Amino acid sequence: GVMVMCSSSLAAAMMMGGGEEKEDPIVPKTPPVLPKAQHVKIARPTGTYPTTAILNIAEIEVFDKVGTNIALNATVTGGPAVHSAGPWANLTDGDYANFAHTLNDGIAFMTIDLGAVKEIAKIVITNRAGYSGSTRMENATVKLLDASQVDVKTTEAIVGEKMKMTYDFNVATPAWVYADA
């Protein structure tokens, strides 16, 4: 029969063949240190509405290490102004069919207040329906801010946005993962 092994089993099997080599003790993997923040802010560099100064986002979900969306129904502020079609509260209401929408020139941003400093494992941004690839989030970054709004962590810029953008702090090298599903 054919033996199927995962890479760690394969390495162990290869190590056992030598006889003289001592097997390494099993060292538990250290879980990543997750960032802690009270505010989650998405912002684009300063620009002109409606081309480079705009955000319209269906939902931003912020998950803790047990997978709870700690941003659900959290208070949202933003600017430079709010578009009447997309009130801030839509960003965290759990409904992918509506959206929050900025208005006017300047720095387009939305900030979620988690209510207290909390450990953050993952952020999932759901784009406004029909806006995958629209560039309305191009070059936006997400900042995690402490209770005093001091920057704790900033993601790299979003480039080539899709329907879903996920940033997972549980992986060795966190980075945006883009998907249209």
Predicted regions: what they are:
Residues G19-V33:
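Acidic, proline-/serine-/threonine-rich low-complexity intrinsically disordered repeat tracts
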Residues P31-A37, T48-V117, R128-T135, A157-A181:
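Disordered, acidic Ser/Thr/Pro-rich linker "stalks" and the adjacent N-terminal cap
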Residues I42, E119-G130:
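A short beta-strand element within beta-rich, extracytoplasmic domains
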Residues I60-V62, I123, V142:
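Extracellular beta-strand elements of beta-rich domains used
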Residues S132-S148:
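Short, surface-exposed beta-strand/strand-loop-strand elements in extracellular ectodomains
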Residues G1-E21:
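Single-pass alpha-helical membrane anchors
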